[in-house]
């Protein structure tokens, strides 16, 4: 079920990607509100997909390539939604929506149903360390995109 939700999120994120492409080509915002609604719905599907994957494999799903790309894509979506709700900078979406789509697409391409976790990643420390790294990368990218706008 989590794979279906990830594919649904990818489809919804593609609306955001289309918004970004059309905005760059036409040099004016093109259907931002539907794209924002699609990204919100995509994030909900994406987060549910990550939770369901974690429930199935019985560990925090960030250790495999598929899981890491998926988690990072979801965090970037969450980071954008938080930044947008606070600052209302819609032009940030031109940079963020393509990254969300690409990360989710790469996660979909590298999907591996094997729940086997490498031995080196069985430490409890990894469950604190890796999410903090991804939060840092997300904050760095959002700040980079915002700085690039100004």
Give the ranges of each region predicted by the language model.
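Polytopic transmembrane helical bundles with strong interfacial aromatic enrichment
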Residues: 1-150
């Amino acid at each position: 079920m989590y794979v279906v939700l990830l594919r649904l999120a990818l489809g919804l994120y593609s609306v955001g990607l289309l918004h970004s492409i059309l905005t760059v080509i036409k040099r004016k915002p093109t259907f931002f509100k539907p794209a924002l609604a699609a990204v919100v719905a995509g994030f909900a599907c994406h987060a549910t997909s990550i939770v369901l994957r974690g429930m199935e494999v019985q560990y925090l799903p960030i250790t495999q390539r598929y899981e890491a790309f998926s988690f990072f894509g979801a965090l970037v979506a969450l980071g954008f939604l938080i930044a947008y709700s606070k600052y209302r900078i819609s032009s940030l979406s031109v940079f963020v929506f393509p990254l969300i789509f690409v990360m989710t697409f790469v996660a979909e391409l590298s999907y591996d149903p094997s729940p086997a976790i490498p031995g080196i990643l069985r430490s409890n420390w990894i469950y604190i360390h890796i999410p903090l790294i991804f939060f840092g990368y997300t904050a760095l990218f959002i700040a980079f995109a915002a700085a690039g706008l100004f």
